[in-house]
Design a protein with these regions (language model features):
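Glycine-rich FAD pyrophosphate-binding loop
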Residues: 1-11
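Short, flexible turn/loop "capping" segments at secondary-structure junctions
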Residues: 13-15, 48, 95-98, 302-307, ...
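Dinucleotide-binding Rossmann-like beta1-alpha1 core, especially the glycine-rich loop
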Residues: 13-91, 364-368, 483
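Flavin (FAD/FMN) cofactor-binding and adjacent substrate-gating region
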Residues: 57-126, 131-132, 138-145, 150, ...
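C-terminal catalytic lobe of FAD-dependent flavoproteins
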Residues: 112-114, 122, 180-181, 185-195, ...
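Core beta-strand elements of the Rossmann-like FAD/NAD(P) dinucleotide-binding domain
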Residues: 155-166, 170
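Low-complexity, small/polar and acidic-rich linker and loop segments
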Residues: 451-509
């Protein structure tokens, strides 16, 4: 109903699981993660950084649990290697020097938005149509058979009917609501809210896990130019309304100190919350989301509810998304009598076919290649200067090295996109200034290119700033307070953004 990756998929800490986190608490999920980790790293190479991971026993942790962990890892077939604590500290000098034991695992970091768009582009190549900002309002059935889906195009305020023979419900924490539209009740999906905080630089270059039973704030992940600490796990009544309580922010900062002493001295730049879609487990309390399984559950509503042509899949993890898709589509194919093999484990998505994994230096490299191609650095072709537009190399966002051409190319391809839609693909406004400088530049460029008029530009800018502020309010301390105050003075004192004319209608998602 919104942009790709705007729900649960894009609201997490960026971890591609090795399985190590779950070898004791959820062995089945651990094995799935271990198997899918290798596949996802290969088929989504441009979205995955092979950082590796360390599970460490901190001074606050029970050393005996590490023995359980070793046995669990062996049984779950999760690859690991125990290394000396001195070696762990050599690899990550900021780690707590009091660690008592360390294990190297195959964790990685992944750009969830890049992964989702890669999968979408692959589907489009096979004939799929991707419809963003389109909310399902009705599912039509003829007797006990699904026949159509009705949706509302939020951007154009249009009703859309899609005739179909089969529906796969993959709505995450909203899956229960979708099932109810067709009369399938009691699909008990519990939304487990978790908050995360991005710090302004990489405190570590390896994923760091505490070697404990899964708990709050026990993972630190290097993602792009930042480090992300997470996460809490609290039942949310409504996945649309996810609070970021200040006490949980303090809890995350304290947890960061346990892993990396001095963590609080680093600059927090943004906080956010996501909702895990957990299938209700009768073995645990309905509010105890931390101990609900991270495994996937497929519900065949034909045998369960007497409604044919619809299945729901609930739970799982981003790391196992491909396996989830395979399993649920296998069920659909079986019911439709379409016997065909799944090829997703072997076929890379567009952008990853060369098999080169993401590196944090990738934009520096791309910038150098562009400059070389325009003759601006030694080795470049001088003849290319005449035919190139040097302005294309203008940097719009210094924090994330986003060039003007990157922005204008994507805007031309997606003219109806909001600046937040573009942010998810380009990382616009995701550095320390949180859009304070780059958002105004991007707005001016969009108007200059003729893609949008001044009125809509103002509306998009205000929406972008509003969404950035949601993640700033809970972490206003230290240097980020000064930055935020400066940004506010610029937008209110210089541009008077609050009082500029905006469009009558704008989808605020």
């Amino acid at each position: 109903k919104a942009d790709l990756g705007q729900g649960t998929t894009g609201r997490y800490h960026g971890l591609l699981h090795s399985g190590g986190r779950y070898v004791v608490s959820d062995p089945g999920s651990a094995t799935e993660c271990a198997e899918e980790n290798e596949i996802v790293t290969r088929i989504h190479a441009d979205a995955v950084e092979k950082t590796g991971g360390l599970l460490v026993v901190t001074p606050e942790d029970d050393l005996e649990f590490s023995d359980q962990w070793v046995e669990g890892a062996k049984k779950s077939k999760v690859p690991f290697e125990e290394i000396a604590t001195a070696e762990a500290l050599r690899r990550e000098p900021r780690l707590n020097p009091g660690i008592k034991r360390a294990f190297a695992v195959q964790d990685g970091s992944v750009d969830g938005w890049q992964m989702v768009w890669g999968a979408a582009h692959s589907a489009i190549e096979y004939g799929a149509k991707v419809m963003t900002y389109t909310a399902v309002t009705e599912i039509i059935r003829e007797g006990d058979q699904i026949s159509a889906v009705v949706a509302h195009d939020l951007k154009h305020d249009e009703r859309i009917r899609i005739d179909c023979k089969f529906v796969i419900n993959t709505a995450g924490p909203w899956a229960g609501r979708i099932a109810e539209l067709v009369g399938c009740h009691d699909v008990d999906v519990v939304a487990g809210r978790g908050i995360m905080i991005a710090m302004n630089h990489r405190l570590v270059n390896t994923v760091i896990n505490r070697c404990i039973y899964p708990a709050d704030g026990d993972i630190l992940v290097p993602v792009h130019t930042v480090s992300i600490i997470g996460t809490t796990d609290v039942k949310a009544d409504d996945p649309e309304r996810l609070a970021i309580p200040r006490n949980e922010v303090q809890q995350m900062l304290d947890s960061g100190e346990t892993l990396v002493p001095g963590f609080r001295d680093a600059r927090a730049v943004h906080a956010w919350a996501g909702a895990r879609p957990l299938f209700k487990d009768k073995r645990v309390s309905s509010t105890d989301t931390r101990h609900m399984s991270r495994g996937m559950s497929i519900l065949d509503h034909g045998s369960r509810d007497g409604v044919n042509g619809i299945v729901s899949i609930i739970g799982g993890k981003l790391t196992t998304y491909r396996l989830m898709a395979k399993n649920v589509v296998d069920v659909m194919c079986e019911q439709l009598g379409d016997d065909r093999p799944c090829r997703t484990a072997d076929e890379a998505v567009p952008g990853s076919t060369v098999g080169k994994n993401y590196l944090i230096t990738h934009r520096l490299g791309e910038n150098e290649e562009r400059r070389a191609g325009t003759g601006l650095v030694r080795g470049g072709d001088p003849k290319a200067v005449a035919s190139s537009k040097k302005i294309d190399n203008q940097v719009i966002c210094e924090c994330e090295l986003m060039s003007r051409k990157m922005f204008t190319d994507l805007l031309a391809d997606q003219p109806d996109a909001t600046f937040d839609d573009l942010r998810r693909q380009l990382r616009l406004g995701m550095g320390p200034c949180q859009g304070g400088f780059c958002s105004m530049r991007a707005t001016g460029v969009a108007v200059e290119e003729g893609t949008i008029d001044a009125e809509r530009a103002t509306g998009l800018l205000r929406l972008f700033l509003k969404n950035r502020w949601i993640g700033l309010w809970p972490i206003l301390y230290g240097e980020q307070v000064r930055q935020t105050a400066l940004d506010d003075w610029i937008f209110q004192g210089t541009f008077d953004v609050e009082h500029l004319p905006t469009p009558q209608q704008e989808v605020e998602l």
